[in-house]
A protein has these predicted regions:
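Extended, histidine- and acidic-residue-enriched regions that form the cofactor-binding/catalytic faces
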Residues: 15-17, 54, 262-263
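Hydrophobic alpha-helical segments of integral membrane proteins
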Residues: 3-8, 56, 60-64, 249-256
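Membrane-interface helix-boundary motifs at transmembrane edges
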Residues: 29-37
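Membrane-embedded alpha-helical segments of integral membrane proteins
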Residues: 1-29
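Central hydrophobic cores of alpha-helical transmembrane segments
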Residues: 38-45
Length: 264
C-alpha cells in the first residue's frame, strides 16, 4: 500500500496536474480544437497563478494551521505526558554536491521545538523521534540517527532521547510510536504524548494518533503563515508560495486518502 500511495499521490497534486493540463492543451491545439485548448490553457495558468500568490496560499495554510487547537503542554485530562514525540520531516543524504547528511528545514524546526520543550519541562519528559525513510528506492534510514547526534551534542542525555527508524509515513510513525510506548509504559492506556510536527501536518497527525488510541497534545512547529496583510508583491507569482500551497494540498489529499482507507 505504501508504494501504491507514493505512485498515485503525485497525480492529485499541482505540479503533475498543471503538467497534464499543459499537455492536454497542446494536444487540443494540435488537433485545431482552439476553443477547448484556450479554455484548458486559461484554467491551467489560472490555477498556477492562484496557488503562487499570497492570498490563496494564506487561505490554504490557515485552513490547516487553525484546524487543531494548541494545548500548550497539557490536555483536558491534566494527565502528565509520557513522551515528547517528534515526527520526522525528511533528511538529505550526502553525495557529490553535499558533503554530509543533513536534516531538512522542517525536521530542524521540529527537532528544535522538541529540544526547547524538553528543557521547558525540566528534562522530565523523554523525547521520541519517529522516522525511518519515506523514499521508495532508498530504504536506509538516516534522519532519526542524525537527530540523536544533534540532541546528544546539545546536552540531552542519551537515555532521554529515543528513536524509531522503521516507519515510512505518518501512519507508520504513529503505529511504531505506539509500539514503543506500549513496551515502555505497559500499564498506561491511553498514552498521553506531546506531539510535535509541522503546523500544516498537525491535523492529519492528530487524527491518526487518536485513531491509534493515543492521547496527543498538539505542539506545532514550522509555521508557514507570515502575515495577515498583503502587499503588491504578494500578488506576483512566487516559487516559494507555490511550494507552500502544494504542501498544504498534499496534506488535504493525505487526509482524504487516509479517511477513505479508514486510518482516521
Amino acid at each position: 500500500m505504501f508504494v501504491i500511495l507514493k505512485l498515485i499521490k503525485p497525480f492529485f497534486l499541482p505540479p503533475t496536474l498543471i503538467l497534464l493540463g499543459m499537455v492536454f492543451c497542446l494536444w487540443l491545439l494540435l488537433r485545431k480544437r482552439w476553443r477547448w485548448g484556450t479554455i484548458i490553457l486559461t484554467a491551467t495558468l489560472g490555477i498556477y497563478y492562484l496557488l503562487s500568490t499570497g492570498p490563496v496560499n494564506y487561505l490554504l495554510v490557515r485552513s490547516l494551521e487553525t484546524a487543531t487547537p494548541i494545548f500548550l503542554g497539557t490536555d483536558d485530562s491534566g494527565a502528565k505526558p509520557e513522551a515528547i514525540v517528534i515526527l520526522a520531516g525528511g533528511a538529505w543524504r550526502s553525495g557529490p554536491t553535499r558533503p554530509r547528511d543533513e536534516l531538512s528545514g522542517p525536521s530542524w524546526r521540529r527537532l528544535w521545538r522538541g529540544l526547547e520543550l524538553y528543557r521547558e519541562r525540566d528534562g522530565k519528559i523523554p523525547i521520541l523521534y519517529s522516522g525511518g525513510n519515506g523514499e521508495l528506492f532508498d530504504r536506509a534510514p538516516i534522519e532519526a540517527n542524525l537527530t540523536r547526534g544533534y540532541a546528544l551534542t546539545s546536552g540531552i542525555p542519551e537515555s532521554d532521547f529515543m528513536i524509531e527508524t522503521t516507519s515510512r509515513n505518518t501512519y507508520e510513525n504513529i503505529r511504531e510510536t505506539k509500539k514503543i510506548l506500549d513496551h515502555k509504559f505497559p500499564s498506561s492506556d491511553p498514552h498521553h504524548i506531546i506531539l510535535i510536527t509541522s503546523s500544516i501536518h498537525m491535523p492529519r497527525a492528530v487524527l491518526i494518533a487518536k485513531k491509534a488510541g493515543l492521547a496527543p497534545i498538539p505542539e506545532p512547529a514550522d509555521f508557514l503563515v507570515r502575515s495577515t496583510s498583503f502587499g503588491l508583491l504578494d500578488f506576483f507569482p512566487s516559487a516559494e508560495t507555490f511550494l507552500n500551497s502544494t504542501r498544504c494540498l498534499n496534506e488535504w489529499v493525505g487526509i482524504v486518502a487516509y479517511r477513505i482507507m479508514g486510518r482516521l
